[in-house]
Amino acid sequence: MAASESYPDELLYHSEHDWALIDGDEAVLGVTWFAQDALGELVHYEAPDVGSTVSKDASYGEVESVKAVSDLISPLSGEVLEVNQKVVDAPETVNDDPYGDGWLIRIRMSTPGERDQLLSVGEYRKVLEDA
């Protein structure tokens, strides 16, 4: 069952419709409700390798839906510590729970100050109004 539209206050957002949950020098990354809704049902997740590096504003993987193949754009730079195997095995998990079980990767941030460039939920909602 698809998730209802929501944008949790505790997350930081990127204008490319990604989110970050920051805990110390680590961050969990995923795509927003808006992104999964626009894509439709996800059928494949091409994840980065654990130990690889992701860069802010650059692609770190792909998701394929019944509508399109889309790059995943990282909101932060860092080393991939963990890939959500549940999403690799069942990509539709992102549609069902984009902020919970549908997270994509966990990273150790290499440039913690980048988080200051991310958007609050209020700022992200303004991006959505212009979308």
What is the predicted function of each stretch?
Residues 77, 81-82, 88-89, 95:
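Charged, amphipathic alpha-helical coiled-coil/dimerization segments
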Residues 20-22, 66, 83-86:
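Residue-level recognition of beta-strand microenvironments
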Residues 1-59, 92, 96-131:
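Acidic, low-complexity mobile loops and tails
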